[in-house]
UniProtKB/Swiss-Prot annotation:
<keyword id="KW-0201">Cytochrome c-type biogenesis</keyword>
<feature type="transmembrane region" description="Helical">
    <location>
        <begin position="386"/>
        <end position="406"/>
    </location>
</feature>
<dbReference type="InterPro" id="IPR028250">
    <property type="entry name" value="DsbDN"/>
</dbReference>
<comment type="similarity">
    <text>Belongs to the thioredoxin family. DsbD subfamily.</text>
</comment>
<dbReference type="InterPro" id="IPR036929">
    <property type="entry name" value="DsbDN_sf"/>
</dbReference>
<dbReference type="GO" id="GO:0005886">
    <property type="term" value="C:plasma membrane"/>
</dbReference>
<dbReference type="Pfam" id="PF02683">
    <property type="entry name" value="DsbD_TM"/>
</dbReference>
<dbReference type="Pfam" id="PF13098">
    <property type="entry name" value="Thioredoxin_2"/>
</dbReference>
<dbReference type="GO" id="GO:0047134">
    <property type="term" value="F:protein-disulfide reductase [NAD(P)H] activity"/>
</dbReference>
<feature type="disulfide bond" description="Redox-active">
    <location>
        <begin position="182"/>
        <end position="304"/>
    </location>
</feature>
<keyword id="KW-1015">Disulfide bond</keyword>
<protein>
    <recommendedName>
        <fullName>Thiol:disulfide interchange protein DsbD</fullName>
        <ecNumber>1.8.1.8</ecNumber>
    </recommendedName>
</protein>
<keyword id="KW-0676">Redox-active center</keyword>
<dbReference type="InterPro" id="IPR017937">
    <property type="entry name" value="Thioredoxin_CS"/>
</dbReference>
<keyword id="KW-0249">Electron transport</keyword>
<feature type="transmembrane region" description="Helical">
    <location>
        <begin position="296"/>
        <end position="316"/>
    </location>
</feature>
<feature type="domain" description="Thioredoxin">
    <location>
        <begin position="434"/>
        <end position="565"/>
    </location>
</feature>
Amino acid sequence: MAQRIFTLILLLCSTSVFAGLFDAPGRSHFVPADQAFAFDFQQNQHDLNLTWQIKDGYYLYRKQIRITPEHAKIADVQLPQGVWHEDEFYGKSEIYRDRLTLPVTINQASAGATLTVTYQGCADAGFCYPPETKTVPLSEVVANNAASQPVSVPQQEQHTAQLPFSALWALLIGIGIAFTPCVLPMYPLISGIVLGGKQRLSTARALLLTFIYVQGMALTYTALGLVVAAAGLQFQAALQHPYVLIGLAIVFTLLAMSMFGLFTLQLPSSLQTHLTLMSNRQQGGSPGGVFVMGAIAGLICSPCTTAPLSAILLYIAQSGNMWLGGGMLYLYALGMGLPLMLITVFGNRLLPKSGPWMEQVKTAFGFVILALPIFLLERVIGDIWGLRLWSALGVAFFGWAFITSLQAKRGWMRVVQIILLAAALVSVRPLQDWAFGATHTAQTQTHLNFTQIKTVDELNQALVEAKGKPVMLDLYADWCVACKKFEKYTFSDPQVQKALADTVLLQANVTANDAQDVALLKHLNVLGLPTILFFDGQGQEHPQARVTGFMDAETFSAHLRDRQP
């Protein structure tokens, strides 16, 4: 008897295993969103805990979590740090796995108040769910005196994370600014003033006084960074508006033009004179006097330092990050002060000779500043035009560097010239494709010609108009990574296009996830994307042919041969 039961169990297991082995490759093995991201909440007076139990093999996007109160006031919601996840289309993003607990402090809630929670996630296997929205009913909460102003979850964190420069760049920029024609010749004079004209100070004493001077200058710059970052944080949403981004890009361009020598940008001469007189009244050689001199020097901007400093300040305002703001300006001042410290200790023998090269350093920083408006405009004009602007900047910079290097007499500069010329030729490729239409022609040849639909009625009408032909419906969204992989790798394949030559191709873009999109997905019983459906000539779907998840061109071609009606 026991042997028969054991044999029966083996047969049942074998059946399930073979069913899994020979299951359709496109059949869905993904769970509904509520099972992938089990959401729950618990409120205790002012304290509300939102929890997500995330199924193994799935993850939530940190930047897609939004919390909106209705008839309630909540404190600032601090999203915990996630783990970094990278894909080829969206780059690095922070995600949550396993479990997420999000505490929310409710300052006040009226009767009938609610909290709308929106989130979105994907599966590691290449399947993304539409944004999920949950409504959390709130118990009535009376405001207390300590209640803070209501704010919403910061939604601009992804912009901060994507800023193109780190604080270390500020240190390098500060060092570079030290070698511009407005700054470098002043260092011997500043060194003498800092030491109070005393030539017999010990090396340690001279280094200490110079360090104190640099710290005074750094204090001024750090304070500027903190103030600007705090102001940027208050107006963070406004600073992301397209008109504001365009305005900032124009300002950055003007700052770069000043570095090219088109005009001079500096503080009014009367203010500079007043600050200089204040500095001269300080006693050189004493720590207190030297510190004040450095702090005042931070306010006296020369024509060579005004534009880079203004660019960094505007950059910090965009970030709204006070730690970044203070840190960048501190490192910027430290970079400017390092050559001064070396000159004070070792003398002028370390100081390079003045010459035209200092103007070239200033011009090079103009190109660095020009990178910032392109970074800002990419959010407005898109990746394609952004690439063209980067191409134009690269051609301009490498072309200028090549022409400048022709003045050099040393033999090894010929190698540098060849490298610069090659870099310019590589940089011009996106502009060449744009001018001669190569990219457009390639896209025309490699992309399927889909007919777009939006609603259930439009789908039904398209099925009727197919007139007996088989129909393929592709459900697409910008937030679906695998959908973009389908476009780039699968739909561009000649074998796939040939197999679909006699098929009516429909596509529904559900990026907005509005009411019509939700209704369409519900009508088709679609859990997430990518999902591709196949209909026969009578407009009836073939459920066994449905594709969920990514397929490469070879697998999809085989699926079309085996499954398509």
